[in-house]
Protein backbone atom coordinates (compact mmCIF):
# COMPACT_ATOMS: atom_id res chain seq x y z
CA UNK A 1 0.00 0.00 0.00
CA UNK A 2 1.42 3.42 -0.97
CA UNK A 3 2.20 6.05 1.61
CA UNK A 4 -0.37 8.43 0.07
CA UNK A 5 -3.11 5.80 0.26
CA UNK A 6 -2.31 5.12 3.91
CA UNK A 7 -2.53 8.83 4.73
CA UNK A 8 -5.85 9.07 2.86
CA UNK A 9 -7.33 6.16 4.83
CA UNK A 10 -6.17 7.59 8.18
CA UNK A 11 -7.75 10.94 7.32
CA UNK A 12 -11.05 9.32 6.35
CA UNK A 13 -11.10 7.30 9.58
CA UNK A 14 -10.55 10.45 11.64
CA UNK A 15 -13.42 12.20 9.84
CA UNK A 16 -15.76 9.28 10.57
CA UNK A 17 -14.82 9.33 14.28
CA UNK A 18 -15.46 13.08 14.56
CA UNK A 19 -18.80 12.73 12.77
CA UNK A 20 -19.88 9.98 15.15
CA UNK A 21 -18.93 12.06 18.18
CA UNK A 22 -20.87 15.02 16.82
CA UNK A 23 -23.98 12.91 16.26
CA UNK A 24 -23.74 11.46 19.77
CA UNK A 25 -23.41 14.93 21.25
CA UNK A 26 -26.36 16.23 19.27
CA UNK A 27 -28.49 13.25 20.34
CA UNK A 28 -27.50 13.81 23.97
CA UNK A 29 -28.41 17.49 23.71
CA UNK A 30 -31.68 16.60 22.02
CA UNK A 31 -32.58 14.09 24.73
CA UNK A 32 -31.68 16.58 27.44
CA UNK A 33 -33.80 19.29 25.82
CA UNK A 34 -36.73 16.89 25.52
CA UNK A 35 -36.40 15.95 29.17
CA UNK A 36 -36.32 19.61 30.22
CA UNK A 37 -39.38 20.33 28.09
CA UNK A 38 -41.26 17.46 29.70
CA UNK A 39 -40.36 18.80 33.16
CA UNK A 40 -41.64 22.26 32.22
CA UNK A 41 -44.92 20.86 30.90
CA UNK A 42 -45.97 19.21 34.18
CA UNK A 43 -46.89 20.45 37.64
CA UNK A 44 -45.84 17.89 40.25
CA UNK A 45 -48.01 18.33 43.33
CA UNK A 46 -47.19 16.60 46.61
CA UNK A 47 -49.89 15.49 49.05
CA UNK A 48 -50.51 12.62 51.48
CA UNK A 49 -53.59 11.24 49.73
CA UNK A 50 -54.75 10.27 53.22
CA UNK A 51 -56.30 13.40 54.77
CA UNK A 52 -59.96 13.41 53.74
CA UNK A 53 -61.73 15.55 52.74
CA UNK A 54 -58.65 17.54 51.66
CA UNK A 55 -57.07 14.56 49.92
CA UNK A 56 -57.46 10.79 49.81
CA UNK A 57 -56.64 7.65 47.83
CA UNK A 58 -59.21 5.77 45.74
CA UNK A 59 -59.19 2.98 43.17
CA UNK A 60 -60.60 4.76 40.10
CA UNK A 61 -60.91 8.17 38.46
CA UNK A 62 -64.48 8.86 39.57
CA UNK A 63 -65.41 12.37 40.72
CA UNK A 64 -62.42 13.90 38.96
CA UNK A 65 -59.72 11.93 40.78
CA UNK A 66 -56.20 12.06 39.30
CA UNK A 67 -53.87 9.08 38.95
CA UNK A 68 -51.02 8.96 41.44
CA UNK A 69 -47.54 8.89 39.92
CA UNK A 70 -46.07 5.39 39.87
CA UNK A 71 -49.28 3.79 41.12
CA UNK A 72 -52.51 2.25 39.88
CA UNK A 73 -54.42 4.30 42.49
CA UNK A 74 -55.93 7.76 42.23
CA UNK A 75 -56.07 10.85 44.45
CA UNK A 76 -59.22 12.85 45.03
CA UNK A 77 -60.42 15.59 47.35
CA UNK A 78 -60.51 19.34 47.85
CA UNK A 79 -56.75 19.73 47.37
CA UNK A 80 -56.88 17.84 44.07
CA UNK A 81 -59.62 20.15 42.76
CA UNK A 82 -57.52 23.19 43.68
CA UNK A 83 -54.45 21.59 42.06
CA UNK A 84 -56.38 21.00 38.83
CA UNK A 85 -57.33 24.67 38.62
CA UNK A 86 -53.75 25.77 39.23
CA UNK A 87 -52.32 23.37 36.64
CA UNK A 88 -54.88 24.49 34.04
CA UNK A 89 -54.03 28.15 34.62
CA UNK A 90 -50.32 27.42 34.20
CA UNK A 91 -50.93 25.34 31.07
CA UNK A 92 -49.37 22.27 32.65
CA UNK A 93 -50.31 18.62 33.10
CA UNK A 94 -51.08 17.80 36.73
CA UNK A 95 -49.00 15.01 38.27
CA UNK A 96 -49.88 13.85 41.78
CA UNK A 97 -46.94 12.64 43.88
CA UNK A 98 -48.10 10.76 46.98
CA UNK A 99 -45.81 11.88 49.81
CA UNK A 100 -45.79 11.34 53.58
CA UNK A 101 -46.48 14.49 55.60
CA UNK A 102 -42.95 14.80 56.99
CA UNK A 103 -41.52 14.31 53.50
CA UNK A 104 -43.41 17.16 51.81
CA UNK A 105 -41.01 20.02 52.60
CA UNK A 106 -37.87 17.99 51.74
CA UNK A 107 -39.51 16.85 48.49
CA UNK A 108 -40.24 20.45 47.53
CA UNK A 109 -36.77 21.70 48.41
CA UNK A 110 -35.11 18.87 46.44
CA UNK A 111 -37.27 19.45 43.32
CA UNK A 112 -39.06 16.10 43.61
CA UNK A 113 -42.31 18.11 43.58
CA UNK A 114 -43.17 21.62 42.40
CA UNK A 115 -45.85 22.48 44.94
CA UNK A 116 -47.42 21.30 48.19
CA UNK A 117 -51.22 21.30 48.06
CA UNK A 118 -51.97 19.20 51.10
CA UNK A 119 -54.03 21.13 53.62
CA UNK A 120 -50.83 22.71 54.95
CA UNK A 121 -50.99 25.79 57.16
CA UNK A 122 -48.57 28.64 56.34
CA UNK A 123 -46.98 28.83 59.78
CA UNK A 124 -44.07 31.24 60.41
CA UNK A 125 -41.71 28.28 60.92
CA UNK A 126 -42.55 26.78 57.53
CA UNK A 127 -42.46 30.20 55.86
CA UNK A 128 -38.79 30.47 56.82
CA UNK A 129 -38.07 27.52 54.56
CA UNK A 130 -40.59 27.80 51.71
CA UNK A 131 -42.95 30.38 50.21
CA UNK A 132 -46.73 30.25 50.55
CA UNK A 133 -49.50 31.55 48.34
CA UNK A 134 -52.70 33.21 49.46
CA UNK A 135 -54.93 30.96 51.57
CA UNK A 136 -57.20 28.64 49.62
CA UNK A 137 -59.24 27.53 52.65
CA UNK A 138 -59.79 28.68 56.22
CA UNK A 139 -61.24 26.57 59.01
CA UNK A 140 -61.09 26.13 62.79
CA UNK A 141 -59.94 23.47 65.24
CA UNK A 142 -62.42 21.05 66.81
CA UNK A 143 -62.09 17.80 68.76
CA UNK A 144 -63.29 14.50 67.30
CA UNK A 145 -64.55 12.09 69.97
CA UNK A 146 -66.89 9.14 70.48
CA UNK A 147 -70.60 9.84 69.95
CA UNK A 148 -72.37 9.23 73.27
CA UNK A 149 -69.02 9.06 75.05
CA UNK A 150 -67.77 10.88 78.15
CA UNK A 151 -66.72 13.95 76.16
CA UNK A 152 -69.42 14.16 73.49
CA UNK A 153 -71.26 16.95 75.33
CA UNK A 154 -68.17 19.02 76.15
CA UNK A 155 -68.50 22.77 75.69
CA UNK A 156 -65.10 24.12 76.75
CA UNK A 157 -61.49 23.00 76.78
CA UNK A 158 -61.76 22.43 80.53
CA UNK A 159 -64.40 19.77 79.89
CA UNK A 160 -61.67 17.64 78.29
CA UNK A 161 -59.60 17.50 81.49
CA UNK A 162 -58.27 13.97 81.92
CA UNK A 163 -59.02 13.02 78.31
CA UNK A 164 -56.44 11.18 76.20
CA UNK A 165 -56.00 13.50 73.22
CA UNK A 166 -53.63 13.44 70.26
CA UNK A 167 -53.23 14.80 66.73
CA UNK A 168 -50.86 14.64 63.78
CA UNK A 169 -47.10 14.77 64.16
CA UNK A 170 -45.42 18.14 63.49
CA UNK A 171 -48.66 20.14 63.22
CA UNK A 172 -50.24 23.05 65.05
CA UNK A 173 -53.14 20.69 65.78
CA UNK A 174 -50.87 18.76 68.10
CA UNK A 175 -49.28 21.83 69.69
CA UNK A 176 -52.62 23.35 70.79
CA UNK A 177 -53.44 20.30 72.90
CA UNK A 178 -51.31 21.93 75.60
CA UNK A 179 -54.10 24.49 76.03
CA UNK A 180 -56.41 21.83 77.50
CA UNK A 181 -56.18 21.84 81.32
CA UNK A 182 -54.99 18.54 82.84
CA UNK A 183 -55.12 16.79 79.48
CA UNK A 184 -53.39 13.45 78.89
CA UNK A 185 -51.47 14.38 75.77
CA UNK A 186 -50.82 11.19 73.84
CA UNK A 187 -47.98 10.57 71.39
CA UNK A 188 -48.53 12.29 68.04
CA UNK A 189 -49.63 10.07 65.16
CA UNK A 190 -48.53 10.00 61.53
CA UNK A 191 -51.96 10.25 59.95
CA UNK A 192 -55.62 10.92 60.67
CA UNK A 193 -56.54 7.43 59.54
CA UNK A 194 -54.41 6.13 62.44
CA UNK A 195 -56.26 8.46 64.81
CA UNK A 196 -59.64 7.20 63.66
CA UNK A 197 -58.57 3.62 64.38
CA UNK A 198 -57.20 4.64 67.79
CA UNK A 199 -60.42 6.46 68.68
CA UNK A 200 -62.60 3.55 67.54
CA UNK A 201 -60.59 1.11 69.65
CA UNK A 202 -60.54 3.34 72.74
CA UNK A 203 -56.79 3.96 72.73
CA UNK A 204 -57.56 7.70 72.73
CA UNK A 205 -60.59 9.75 73.77
CA UNK A 206 -60.29 12.23 70.95
CA UNK A 207 -58.08 14.07 68.52
CA UNK A 208 -57.73 17.67 67.38
CA UNK A 209 -58.61 18.27 63.74
CA UNK A 210 -59.73 20.97 61.37
CA UNK A 211 -63.49 21.11 61.00
CA UNK A 212 -63.60 19.56 57.48
CA UNK A 213 -61.69 16.49 58.66
CA UNK A 214 -64.02 16.20 61.66
CA UNK A 215 -67.09 16.35 59.42
CA UNK A 216 -65.45 13.74 57.20
CA UNK A 217 -64.74 11.42 60.15
CA UNK A 218 -68.23 11.69 61.65
CA UNK A 219 -69.83 11.21 58.22
CA UNK A 220 -67.80 8.07 57.63
CA UNK A 221 -68.36 6.59 61.10
CA UNK A 222 -71.62 6.99 63.03
CA UNK A 223 -69.74 6.25 66.26
CA UNK A 224 -67.86 9.55 65.92
CA UNK A 225 -68.91 13.10 66.61
CA UNK A 226 -67.01 16.36 66.96
CA UNK A 227 -67.11 19.17 69.48
CA UNK A 228 -67.06 22.83 68.45
CA UNK A 229 -65.95 24.61 71.58
CA UNK A 230 -67.58 27.78 72.91
CA UNK A 231 -64.27 28.85 74.41
CA UNK A 232 -61.87 27.11 72.07
CA UNK A 233 -58.22 27.04 71.16
CA UNK A 234 -56.30 30.29 70.94
CA UNK A 235 -54.60 30.28 67.55
CA UNK A 236 -52.97 32.51 64.99
CA UNK A 237 -54.95 32.93 61.73
CA UNK A 238 -52.13 31.11 59.92
CA UNK A 239 -52.77 28.05 62.07
CA UNK A 240 -56.28 27.50 60.74
CA UNK A 241 -55.67 28.51 57.12
CA UNK A 242 -54.23 26.38 54.34
CA UNK A 243 -52.09 27.61 51.46
CA UNK A 244 -49.99 26.24 48.63
CA UNK A 245 -46.32 25.70 49.44
CA UNK A 246 -43.76 26.72 46.80
CA UNK A 247 -39.99 26.96 46.60
CA UNK A 248 -38.54 30.34 47.52
CA UNK A 249 -38.71 32.68 44.55
CA UNK A 250 -41.04 30.51 42.45
CA UNK A 251 -41.88 32.51 39.32
CA UNK A 252 -45.42 31.10 39.22
CA UNK A 253 -46.45 32.43 42.63
CA UNK A 254 -48.24 35.55 41.36
CA UNK A 255 -50.13 33.58 38.72
CA UNK A 256 -51.19 30.98 41.29
CA UNK A 257 -52.36 33.74 43.64
CA UNK A 258 -54.56 35.07 40.84
CA UNK A 259 -56.15 31.63 40.50
CA UNK A 260 -56.82 31.39 44.24
CA UNK A 261 -58.26 34.90 44.51
CA UNK A 262 -60.66 34.10 41.67
CA UNK A 263 -62.26 31.29 43.70
CA UNK A 264 -65.10 32.83 45.73
CA UNK A 265 -65.89 31.80 49.30
CA UNK A 266 -69.11 30.24 48.03
CA UNK A 267 -67.19 28.16 45.48
CA UNK A 268 -64.72 27.06 48.14
CA UNK A 269 -67.50 25.85 50.39
CA UNK A 270 -69.19 24.07 47.48
CA UNK A 271 -65.92 22.32 46.63
CA UNK A 272 -65.48 21.28 50.27
CA UNK A 273 -69.07 20.02 50.52
CA UNK A 274 -68.54 17.98 47.35
CA UNK A 275 -65.30 16.57 48.73
CA UNK A 276 -66.99 15.51 51.96
CA UNK A 277 -69.78 13.82 49.98
CA UNK A 278 -67.36 12.13 47.56
CA UNK A 279 -64.83 10.74 50.02
CA UNK A 280 -64.71 6.92 49.65
CA UNK A 281 -65.84 6.18 53.22
CA UNK A 282 -68.96 8.32 52.76
CA UNK A 283 -70.33 6.13 49.95
What are the residue ranges of the model-derived segments?
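Periplasmic-binding protein-like
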Residues: 138-147, 219-260, 278-283
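Extended ligand-binding regions for polar small-molecule ligands
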Residues: 22, 80-89, 162, 171, ...
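Short helix-initiation/N-cap motifs at beta->coil->alpha
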Residues: 78, 96-108, 152, 187-197, ...
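A ligand-binding cleft/hinge motif common to bilobed small-molecule-binding domains
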Residues: 120-128, 176-179, 201, 205-238
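Extracytoplasmic small-molecule ligand-binding "clamshell" domains
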Residues: 37-120
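C-terminal motif of bacterial Sec signal peptides marking the signal peptidase cleavage site
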Residues: 17-20
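Short, low-complexity, disordered segments immediately C-terminal to signal peptides
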Residues: 22-41
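Acidic, polar ligand-binding/catalytic clefts
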Residues: 93-159, 235
Amino acid sequence: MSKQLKLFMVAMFAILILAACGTSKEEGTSNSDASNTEEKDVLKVGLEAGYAPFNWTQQDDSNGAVKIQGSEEYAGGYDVEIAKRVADALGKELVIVKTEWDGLLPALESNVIDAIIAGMSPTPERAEVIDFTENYYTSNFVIVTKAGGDFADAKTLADFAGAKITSQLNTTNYAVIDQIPDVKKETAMESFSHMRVALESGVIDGYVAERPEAISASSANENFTYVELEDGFKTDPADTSVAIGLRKGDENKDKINEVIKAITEEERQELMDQAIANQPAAK
